[in-house]
Structures are given as structure tokens and as C-alpha cells.
Amino acid sequence: MKIIKKLYNFCFTGIYKIDLIRTAIVLLRFFYFYYILKNIKHYSESQENNEDHIEIHRNDKKYNVISHNMHFVENLRNLKSTYRKFNGSKTASLIYPFKAIDFINYNENKILSVGPRNEGELFLIRSLGFNWKNIKSLDLISYSSLTDLGDIHNTSYSDNSFDQIVCGWVLTYSNKFEKILTELLRIVKDKGLISIGFTYIPKDIDKKRIYDKNTIPLDSTEQILEKFKNNIEHVYFNFDAKKNDPLKKRHSIIILRVKK
């Protein structure tokens, strides 16, 4: 029975590695849940702590984080753009390095995806070999049972819940990114991995993200290292876009192992 189960998981892992097939599955599920079942849910404004979240200015309009994140359902007829939004490729740089770390147990480890918007990121994680029962995600919006509705500033997960946490392009939408880092540290297990990505944008060209006047935004991985300084066992990867070229908009990525 175990052999059949392993063969089953192996076959589906291989199928999910095929970008076109994986993305097609994600899109079909999205159209079914979002348009047919109309299953979209938002973390309610009464629950959302607006002081934690920034305001976004886009196309001469103001958005909160929830309404801004819903832009992934816009302009779906643009096939190239839609494919990119649903194939999870933006997260590849955060999770593919896991394959170079030999202590990860893909059969047993529990992994959390923070702020995936759609299921593309989750199916990409599954393609690495993680079991569905061990994959969770959390977002302010959800259209399927694969994503828990909630706010990463303050989650309902128990202490030491996850072996790996992937947090891509979330921290810079917060006025209190250190609060999120504290929560990530709480819910990750001892010796667990935290993989973080965010976009560095020089202040003089960052016209979309509007922070509270007293906020010091995240713009360098050095701020993450400082916050975690007493809880870092090893830093496996650290690309700081600001340090590399402070005049250019780019992605910063850091992957580290924590100790508690």
C-alpha cells in the first residue's frame, strides 16, 4: 500500500513540474471556484487592522491591500499576463533553493505560504514533492479551501506549527513589517526555514506604496537580519537589492534557518 501511495505521489509530483499542465489546473480551479461557485472571501474590514496595512495608489485611485491584491483577476484576456499571474513563477526563487538543502523532509514537513493570492504558488510548492496535507496558505483573500483566510500580522496558528514558511512580497505592504517577522518566528519550528522575498524600490520612485508617516519601511534584508539576530542558526541565501544597487528597483531575497 505504501509503495502504491509513493508511486501515486511521485507521478503527480512529476505532472505538477510541467509548467503548462500545472498552470492549466490552477486556472481551471480558479474559474470554477471564483466564477461558477462565486466562492471568493475577503478578510473583513471590521477584522482587518488598517493601521497594520499600507495604502496603495494605482491608476489615480486609492486601494487598501485587499482591493489592490484583487488585481490578479483583472484583464484575464491578456493570456501572457494571466499565465504569469497563475503559474507561481514569482515564488520559484524562494522555494527552488530548498532542493539544495538536504534536511528537508518532503513527505512529513509542514509548509506555509503567506499571501499567495491564487493557487499558483501552492501547486508550485506541491511540485517540489510536499504532500497536500502538509501545505497551508494564509491570505486576506481566498477562493478555495487550500487558503486560510487571515492576517499574517496576527494568526490563529499554534506556536511551532511549520517546518518551512514562504513569505513572498508581503512585508512591504505592511506599516509594521517587524510585527509580521515576530509572528513568523512564533509559528515556525525550531530549526525551521523562513524564505522571504520583497521588492526594493528606491524612495524617490516609489509612488504607489503609501506608508504611515512614522513608519520605517522594509527596504533591506539587513532589517530582517537585525530583527532575527538572536534567532538565526544559518543564512543560506541573502541577496540585498538595495546594497547591490540602491538606485534600481529589484527583488531582495533571504532564506534562513532559525534557532529557538
Task: Tell me the role of every PLM-derived stretch.
Residues 164-177:
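A short SAM/SAH-binding and catalytic strip from SAM-dependent methyltransferases
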Residues 109-154:
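Class I SAM-dependent methyltransferase SAM/SAH-binding core
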Residues 34-105:
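Class I SAM-dependent methyltransferase Rossmann-like catalytic core
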Residues 230-260:
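Core SAM-dependent methyltransferase catalytic element
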Residues 174-175, 188-190:
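Helix-to-beta-strand junctions that scaffold the AdoMet/dcAdoMet cofactor pocket
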Residues 150-165:
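A short acidic, Gly/Pro-enriched loop at the edge of an enzyme's catalytic core
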Residues 191-200:
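Conserved beta-strand signature within the Rossmann-like core of class I S-adenosyl-L-methionine
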Residues 206-237:
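Conserved Class I S-adenosyl-L-methionine
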